[in-house]
Amino acid sequence: MTTHIVGYFVGSLAKNSINRKLATALVRLAPPGLEMREIPIRDLPLYSYDYDKAYPTAAQALKDALARVDAVLFVTPEYNRSIPGGLKNAIDWASRPWGKNSFSRKPSGIIGTSPGKIGTAVAQQHLRSIMAFCNSPLMNAIEAYI
């Protein structure tokens, strides 16, 4: 049986985040043949193109981790009707430098949970727009706003 590897990002940096709990549940529910690997974002410095010629260790580890997965899943909360800054920072690191976008042609999906009335609907729409620009084929159905 072929094993497919999905790298997942937890958009919240909070240790007890409900999105981290959701990601943990998804890992436990993964069927045989599907391996889930977290791609950590907590230790990334803020992105600047000044680093494009010499990536910091944490940023290079992020790009290396993305190279080892078949697809990406974003498990994200919604902050102020968008994605968390830490997640956007990770996307910026992974998509740079120009011409070395780690998301290009890598399938991705988005899920998230929030105690708010609209869940993570707006954050997911923003993330869809960002990932479309990053040339990542997105799963457009089924959308899940928990």
What is the predicted function of each stretch?
Residues 40-58:
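N-terminal beta-loop-helix "entrance" segment that forms/cooperates
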Residues 25-31, 128-138:
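Active-site-adjacent alpha-helix of alpha/beta-hydrolase-fold enzymes
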